């Protein structure tokens, strides 16, 4: 490699390193700001298991400026796309995944579910119980997402947490 090529490579790497540092600092600033805004609007939302500032902000954006327009937890679940859709035919009675709703909110609830599945023993036993009932893992995860939406609804309205301790018997 020629010395001018080496110098150009070093210069380019230094520029890229500075850019990475600047972007990392910008990301940290934005994360602090998101945390501040979420804490100012719905601090109890951050108390939910598996919820971070990014996920909470996504759910707040989905609920909008007037979360009271969501008349029930079912309307919130439908808005997030975690409400199952009837897909029965003849003697077969079943429900399928809803492809409607806010996909970002659906993805946020999915991330909450994955976080809980990894770290929360109650959620793991809930999923195993649903699978033992004859549901596929995918269907059990869909049930879990619906329960999470049910649990998040009062938090979005600013009501006290109904408690994740209800998970095994309520869901």
Where are these regions (language model features)?
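A detector of single, family-specific signature residues
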Residues: 1-171
């Amino acid at each position: 490699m020629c010395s001018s090529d080496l110098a150009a490579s070093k210069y380019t790497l230094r520029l890229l390193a500075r850019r990475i540092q600047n972007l990392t600092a910008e990301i940290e600033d934005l994360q602090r700001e998101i945390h501040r805004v979420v804490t100012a609007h719905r601090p109890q939302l951050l108390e939910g298991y598996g919820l971070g500032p990014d996920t909470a902000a996504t759910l707040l954006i989905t609920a909008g400026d007037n979360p009271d327009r969501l008349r029930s937890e079912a309307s919130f679940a439908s808005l997030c796309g975690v409400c199952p859709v009837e897909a029965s035919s003849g003697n077969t009675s079943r429900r399928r995944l809803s492809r409607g709703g806010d996909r970002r909110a659906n993805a946020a609830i999915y991330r909450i579910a994955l976080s809980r599945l990894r770290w929360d023993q109650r959620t793991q036993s809930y999923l195993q119980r649903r699978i033992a009932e004859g549901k596929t893992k995918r269907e059990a995860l869909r049930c879990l997402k619906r329960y999470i939406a049910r649990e998040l609804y009062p938090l979005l309205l600013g009501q006290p947490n109904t408690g994740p301790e209800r998970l095994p018997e309520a869901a």
